[in-house]
Amino acid sequence: MDSDASLVSSRPSSPEPDDLFLPARSKGGSSSGFTGGTVSSSTPSDCPPELSSELRGAMGASGAHPGDKLGGGGFKSSSSSTSSSTSSAATSSTKKDKKQMTEPELQQLRLKINSRERKRMHDLNIAMDGLREVMPYAHGPSVRKLSKIATLLLARNYILMLTNSLEEMKRLVSEIYGGHHAGFHPSACGGLAHSAPLPTATAHPAAAAHAAHHPAVHHPILPPAAAAAAAAAAAAAVSSASLPGSGLSSVGSIRPPHGLLKSPSAAAAAPLGGGGGGSGGSGGFQHWGGMPCPCSMCQVPPPHHHVSAMGAGTLPRLTSDAK
């Protein structure tokens, strides 16, 4: 009995576990850290004032909230678990919706998807047929229709070829009309096309008269000095030829200048593209395939005046009229 009474009496007098833990925690709080205090106490108000002040000081020194050490990772894990649960819920709801759909509804959904895909393929085939119609091989002897990939590759090559051709044409036109290769229209065109009547001036007076009015270098792109020199040379060649009298030169002086020929002032005022140009190496104008001569005389052939129809008796009369 005494032992039992002593045991009963000793129980209230014995310290509680919390009373034993708090002094030890207050003594070793600065050395062992605050993790144990945070775990054991649910809120800072449950701790003594000195312990809570120490915890606040330690948390303030570390620059974190008392609940950040333990609550940060928990919040992240909870957010990730929430997102995963949301996605799984959406997937399960979709599956439930499909499962809840009846067989006629599923069949209707399949038909709708199939009709949409069929319309898309129909539009694609129409577009491919329209592209095949404008391809270079469309009117050729091909017997089978190209596939979609082959059609697209052919269209790409065709576009590249046309682009290169256009760039080459632009380069040739800039060389012809640029004006930086030659200062005036070269004499290759005139020498080949318009100087042929000069050697036959002694045999054909009409051709000589035509050459007098249409000299070898007559293009309006020529400078005034070059045009005047060419006209003087042509007149000298005609006058030195063995012609019957000076009647033909008088006819040349009576006739007005050709309507297509421009005066030196007009030629200087309206040059064609800043002067003619030719190929840089040869220095002469070359007629490229499909590109006519840019001068007005080559574009519009002059009307031929039949001077040879005039008899020998009319020439002295014209000479007397001129006098």
UniProtKB/Swiss-Prot annotation:
Expressed specifically in the brain. This is Oligodendrocyte transcription factor 2. Disulfide bonds: none annotated. It is found in: Nucleus; Cytoplasm. PANTHER family: BASIC HELIX-LOOP-HELIX PROTEIN NEUROGENIN-RELATED, OLIGODENDROCYTE TRANSCRIPTION FACTOR 2. Residues 1-107 are annotated as: Disordered. The gene is Olig2. One of its GO terms (biological process) is neuron fate commitment. GO terms for cellular component: cytoplasm; nucleus; transcription regulator complex. The keyword Membrane does not apply. Its main location: nucleus. SMART domains: HLH.
